[in-house]
């Protein structure tokens, strides 16, 4: 079904038209005109009356004056309501069509409806044939841990026919796996008056279910069906039968769940009120002082009341939803929204039945009306969810509940929503944090609907937003013995009785309370991350669940990474200070602060720590609290947060202590922590440039445009640039664009203007050397300046150069100005990029996780062998910026790992063909401008590149400036989408498994070696390694790193690959890792490109004669051309299979975390013919050969 939903939305998007609409406050819904229309059905055209030809009078004038409306038929009421709803309720026709199309796709097929009716009728006949009897033995396993053997249980035939419950009853079944819930009521005679105590009711319920299941398996009607037991909502006290009918009619797409219930009159009224105790301490062998009141068991009581009140609640829901297509469709919309966010899973899940009851509640409160459209139903529910507080209690009770009683009821639960009977809390098992999360998601949905500049449909209904992608850190505890120890030593008896000794809610309560107190303002929410329990065959024993917990932490970016926890002063609050010391243990110390105060405090780091270290503060706090309070060793816990930060750390092969610099650098540093050093050096250089004396023109603006100035450079930049023989050697250069004051003396000829620009740069270099003692070298790209070990490339921007590039003279001698590739490139680099770079820098100041998220995204794309020529780096930065700008989640991203997961989701689920990614920096685009751009994008989609990204600084180039038809191409875009989906599968499997191990970075940040035809290996000693952490090559094992410094600005491999693509892209695709990759992978184009073709003078590139006047492109000839272009860099060509075979036969595999050991122990591998005669020793390794300067000059 999700696949169908995507398809339907795309179809609606293609057929819809964008229109302006205005939001309307829906608080006045009760004044809307009554109608039975659901708001989506298209109005039927009126039936035209047939007119005889003889009576038809032809019109003499088709252009009558406006006042003549005699022949214009007024719109019908249906049409008027349709138009009003479209104008008032929806963004546009597009949104309405998308919703309508999705609802049509969600409608249950008639064959399923017929099957459900027939199955229920058959099952009703079956239950009538059941007989009373003693259950002495059974070959099935009772799906519950019983305190006594199941002997002597007397089965009583049900006196009430089975009935549908849940979605099947309300007409809101949702695929792709259709689950039909059926209730079978135990007769009152099966229960005794004392069965309310000590799980007796639950055990009888399980036995009753087992007996019915056994009889069904004996029946011929169900002999071929699959029978399994499962726990409803991960609740071990709620076993249900899951039956999968084996029939061609439903083809295993339908499942029946059988619930066993009991009549409400089975026990005395008030027996299960929240303040009563129904599980005695003696049941678990505990002693209890008879003078103390027994603890309440409100959660267990609610568990029993779920069964007892099910019949009455379902009857009321049936009454409210029956024959109301608008309510049903509204609930379907809400269920899709809820499922996409995975808020309805597990013991603490916010189930769809709560939303169904809330719709009825709003209807009773006259907030929602029977005439409301399905869209109004969903919108009103979201709005009321966001703005009402259920912690104080709301009630659906037929007989009104007094406020005092409701408050008394609500005190026993985090969230309180009383059902129709006035006895059961529908939200009994929902923790406060999860309820708050539902409210935040609802509030976000309303905000998205109100945003007229956004098509909110895919964000609300289509995009999957699993809960793990909404959290910043994850805590896993899965050691069975440790959990038992925690529950035994630290779970309070009242909690134990309240949850009937079920471990999971006890763990959830214990950990949530501890972490909430310890993390305080650092954390926004602590959410349980659950997966549905797996069904098991009815012949097997019921599995033990609840001995594993996974919590997601949503952090507050403003406070999460503070290095200090400050406690009360010992003099002012001795008791508070003592409690602070007790809570934090040995971590707490008495400290004096600059304001003179002396208080207890806990210090987790220093203000000078790197951002990566500060992001680990929450981890340190959580692990300390678990160890100090629960005696849980850190080895028994997995705290996931920041594991992927390793990929942009400094390579351990490079030793920082050998670097001559005044900076205090740590060996464990990373690209993020090194960026501020470069920015400070740039700021000082900018001040020196502004302060230069005796320049002919004043420098009016200086802009850093390299990624490092916006914290987006994934490779660590160290102060290691050198001046050697009037040449600057540097691994990276930082680009700076300067603009001068106005002058009318610049030449009007392009080459002369560029010569004058070069002369001006030379003069700036001389002034820098004379006044600031900085070394400089002029190059073809600009002025290279060496400062504090960093190399800056200064470029001079001038408006006249841009105008001269656009200038064209027609045949008639008329001068025109036309955009071309060269002018667009210059305009982007010198005028637009500085503005965008400043905006991205500001974005990083607002969201500290932005820069590091970009680092992860860029490293991932690079390790997938996608360089800037296949996927522009700026496209990555802008897509990540789009994530942080748009409201995809209620809270902003606080951890880069979470940002990276959302980036993968963006790549996986976006409709690149239909979506234009807009970045409205500083809100400088008006709504009308955005609407016009989007309209032009949809109308002329073929004129835009496959990936269209636009910023508010792009002017007339919006959508075409940062990407092109070939970068990324449609094929590359599809390839990246598939890679992102696979990466998400790996991450999700790891995060949601009970295994403590998280994915190793190499699992994500190393490309597959499958699918490539050839691999060209470069000479390792001629290609410098990247300073970033090396995760290995997909083709060859690790080799000795090479950190030699190349000539500044000379990225030879990138230039060679660019030449190969420009010359041979019709015959092959080229892939390499721009971050130090030493292999070039090749994929040949389809064989049709290499077929013989007629001789044509214009199509002879790479061709060889093939006879009969034809020519043909030969792969062997192409390979020789590749070798010629690569020159001295070429080592050899091999297939991936040959490389894999060599690794298996000749080399021991080495993992990335063995790198440090390998440095000390590695020796050159002996070659077959490298042994000295008469000895078994290998010949000494050859010295590294430096590439000759003549070869370098040839590549300039």
Swiss-Prot record:
Q: What Pfam families does the entry give?
A: Nrap, Nrap_D2, Nrap_D3, Nrap_D4, Nrap_D5, Nrap_D6
Q: Where is the composition biased (Basic and acidic residues)?
A: 22-31, 65-74
BP-aspect Gene Ontology terms: ribosomal small subunit biogenesis; rRNA processing; tRNA export from nucleus
The family database entries (Gene3D superfamilies) matched by this protein are listed as: 1.10.1410.10, 3.30.70.3030
One GO cellular component term, please give it.
Answer: small-subunit processome
* Cell compartment(s), UniProt: Nucleus, Nucleolus; Chromosome
Query: What's in the keyword line of the UniProt record?
Result: Chromosome, Nucleus, RNA-binding
The region called Disordered is annotated at 1-74, 1140-1196
Give one GO molecular function term. Answer: RNA binding
Q: Does the keyword Transmembrane helix feature in the UniProt annotation? A: no
The Basic residues compositionally biased stretches are 1165-1187
Q: Where does the protein principally reside?
A: nucleus
Q: What does this protein do?
A: Part of the small subunit (SSU) processome, first precursor of the small eukaryotic ribosomal subunit. During the assembly of the SSU processome in the nucleolus, many ribosome biogenesis factors, an RNA chaperone and ribosomal proteins associate with the nascent pre-rRNA and work in concert to generate RNA folding, modifications, rearrangements and cleavage as well as targeted degradation of pre-ribosomal RNA by the RNA exosome.
Q: Which family is it part of?
A: Belongs to the NRAP family.
Q: How does it assemble?
A: Part of the small subunit (SSU) processome, composed of more than 70 proteins and the RNA chaperone small nucleolar RNA (snoRNA) U3.
Q: What is this protein called?
A: Nucleolar protein 6
Which species expresses this protein natively?
Answer: Drosophila simulans
Gene that codes for this? Mat89Ba
């Amino acid at each position: 079904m999700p696949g169908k939903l995507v398809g339907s939305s795309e179809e609606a998007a293609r057929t819809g038209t964008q229109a302006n609409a205005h939001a309307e406050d829906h608080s006045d819904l009760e004044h809307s005109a009554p109608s039975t229309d659901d708001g989506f059905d298209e109005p039927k055209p009126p039936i035209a009356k047939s007119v005889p030809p003889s009576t038809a009078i032809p019109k003499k004038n088709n252009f009558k004056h406006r006042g003549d409306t005699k022949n214009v038929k007024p719109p019908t009421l249906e049409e008027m309501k349709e138009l009003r709803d479209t104008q008032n309720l929806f963004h546009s026709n597009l949104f309405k069509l998308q919703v309508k199309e999705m609802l049509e796709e969600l409608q249950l097929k008639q064959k399923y409806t017929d099957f459900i009716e027939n199955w229920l009728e058959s099952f009703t006949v079956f239950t009538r044939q059941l007989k009373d009897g003693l259950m002495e033995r059974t070959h099935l396993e009772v799906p519950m841990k019983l305190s006594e053997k199941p002997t002597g249980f007397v089965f009583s035939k049900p006196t009430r026919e089975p009935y549908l419950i849940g979605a099947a009853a309300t007409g809101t079944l949702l695929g792709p796996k259709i689950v039909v819930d059926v209730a079978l009521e135990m007769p009152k005679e099966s229960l005794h008056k004392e069965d309310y105590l000590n799980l007796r009711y639950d055990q009888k319920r399980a036995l009753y279910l087992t007996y019915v299941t056994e009889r069904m398996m004996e029946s011929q009607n169900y002999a071929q069906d699959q029978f399994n037991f499962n726990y409803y909502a991960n609740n071990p006290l709620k076993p249900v039968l899951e039956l999968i009918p084996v029939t061609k009619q439903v083809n295993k797409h339908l499942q029946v769940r059988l619930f066993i219930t009991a009549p409400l009159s089975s026990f005395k009224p008030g027996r299960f009120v929240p303040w009563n105790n129904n599980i005695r301490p003696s049941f678990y062998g505990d002693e209890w002082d008879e003078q103390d009141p027994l603890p309440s068991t409100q959660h267990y009581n609610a568990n029993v009341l779920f069964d007892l009140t099910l019949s009455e609640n379902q009857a009321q829901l049936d009454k409210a939803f029956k024959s109301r297509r608008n309510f049903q469709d509204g609930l379907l919309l809400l269920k899709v929204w809820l499922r996409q966010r995975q808020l309805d899973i597990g013991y603490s899940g916010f189930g769809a039945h709560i939303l169904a009851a809330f719709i009825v509640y709003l209807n009773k409160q006259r907030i929602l009306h029977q005439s409301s459209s399905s869209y109004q139903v969903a919108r009103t529910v979201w709005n009321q969810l966001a703005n009402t507080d259920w912690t104080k209690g709301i009630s659906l009770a037929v007989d009104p509940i007094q406020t005092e009683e409701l408050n008394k009821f609500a005190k026993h639960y985090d969230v309180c929503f009383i059902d129709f009977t006035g006895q059961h809390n529908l939200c009994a098992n929902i923790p406060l944090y999860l309820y708050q999360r539902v409210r935040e998601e609802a509030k976000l949905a309303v905000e998205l609907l109100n945003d007229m500049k956004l098509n909110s449909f895919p964000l609300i209904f289509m995009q999957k937003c699993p809960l793990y992608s909404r959290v910043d850190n994850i805590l896993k505890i899965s050691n069975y013995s440790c959990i038992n120890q925690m529950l035994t030593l630290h779970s309070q008896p009242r909690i134990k009785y309240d949850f009937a000794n079920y471990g999971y809610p006890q763990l959830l309560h214990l950990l949530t309370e501890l972490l909430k107190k310890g993390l305080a303002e650092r954390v926004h929410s602590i959410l349980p991350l659950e997966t549905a329990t797996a069904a098991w065959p009815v012949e097997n024993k019921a599995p033990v669940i609840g001995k594993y917990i996974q919590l997601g932490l949503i952090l507050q970016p403003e406070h999460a990474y503070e290095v200090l926890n400050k406690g009360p002063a010992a003099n002012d609050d001795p008791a508070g200070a003592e409690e602070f010391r007790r809570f934090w243990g040995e971590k707490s110390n008495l400290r004096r602060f600059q304001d003179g105060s002396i208080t207890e405090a806990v210090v987790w780091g220093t203000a000078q720590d790197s951002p990566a270290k500060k992001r680990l503060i929450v981890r340190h706090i959580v692990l300390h609290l678990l160890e100090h309070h629960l005696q849980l060793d850190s080895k028994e816990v997995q705290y996931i947060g920041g594991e992927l930060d390793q990929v942009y750390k400094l390579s351990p092969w490079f030793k920082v202590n050998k670097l001559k610099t005044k900076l205090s650098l740590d060996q464990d540093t990373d690209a993020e922590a090194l960026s501020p050093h470069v920015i400070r050096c740039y700021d000082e250089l900018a001040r020196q440039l502004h302060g230069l004396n005796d320049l002919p023109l004043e420098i009016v603006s200086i802009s850093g445009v390299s990624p490092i100035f916006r914290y987006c450079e994934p490779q660590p930049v160290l102060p290691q640039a050198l001046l050697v023989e009037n040449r600057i050697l540097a691994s990276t250069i930082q680009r700076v664009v300067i603009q001068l004051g106005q002058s009318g003396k610049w030449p009007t000829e392009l080459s002369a203007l560029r010569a004058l620009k070069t002369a001006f740069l030379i003069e700036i270099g001389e002034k820098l050397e004379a006044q600031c003692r900085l070394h400089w070298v002029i190059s073809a790209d600009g002025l290279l300046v060496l400062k504090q070990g960093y190399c800056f490339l200064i470029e001079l921007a001038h408006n006249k150069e841009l105008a001269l590039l656009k200038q064209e003279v027609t045949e008639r001698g008329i001068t025109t100005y036309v955009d071309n590739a060269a002018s667009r490139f210059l305009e982007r680099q010198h005028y637009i990029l500085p503005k965008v770079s400043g905006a991205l820098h500001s974005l990083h100041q607002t969201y500290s996780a932005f820069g590091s998220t970009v680092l992860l995204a860029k490293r991932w794309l690079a390790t997938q062998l996608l360089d800037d020529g296949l996927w522009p780096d700026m496209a990555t930065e802008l897509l990540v910026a789009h994530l942080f700008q748009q409201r995809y989640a209620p809270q902003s991203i606080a951890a880069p790992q979470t940002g990276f997961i959302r980036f993968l989701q963006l790549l996986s689920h976006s409709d690149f063909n239909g979506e234009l990614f807009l970045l409205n920096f500083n809100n400088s685009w008006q709504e009308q401008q955005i609407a016009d751009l989007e309209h032009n994008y949809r109308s002329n989609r073929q004129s835009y590149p496959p990936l269209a990204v636009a910023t508010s600084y792009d002017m007339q180039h919006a959508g075409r400036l940062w990407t092109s038809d070939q970068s990324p191409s449609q094929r590359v875009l599809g390839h990246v989408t598939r890679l992102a989906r696979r990466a998400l599968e790996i991450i999700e499997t790891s995060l949601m498994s009970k295994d403590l191990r998280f994915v190793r970075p190499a699992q994500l940040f190393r490309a597959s070696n499958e699918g490539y035809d050839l691999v060209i290996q470069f000479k390792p000693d001629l290609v410098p390694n990247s300073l970033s952490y090396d995760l290995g090559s997909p083709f060859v094992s690790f080799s000795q790193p090479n950190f030699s410094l190349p000539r500044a600005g000379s990225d030879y491999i990138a230039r060679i690959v660019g030449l190969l693509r420009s010359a041979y892209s019709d015959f092959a695709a080229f892939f390499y890792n721009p971050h130090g990759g030493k292999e070039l992978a090749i994929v040949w184009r389809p064989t049709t490109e290499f077929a013989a073709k007629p001789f044509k003078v214009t199509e002879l590139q790479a061709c060889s004669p093939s006879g009969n006047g034809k020519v043909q492109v030969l792969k062997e000839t192409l390979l020789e051309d590749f070798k010629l272009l690569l020159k001295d860099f070429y080592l050899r060509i091999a297939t991936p299979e040959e490389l894999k075979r060599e690794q298996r036969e000749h080399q021991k595999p080495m993992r990335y975390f063995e790198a440090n050991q390998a440095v000390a122990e590695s020796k050159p591998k002996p070659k077959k013919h490298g042994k000295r005669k008469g000895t078994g020793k290998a010949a000494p390794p050859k010295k590294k050969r430096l590439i000759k300067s003549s070869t370098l000059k040839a590549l300039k």
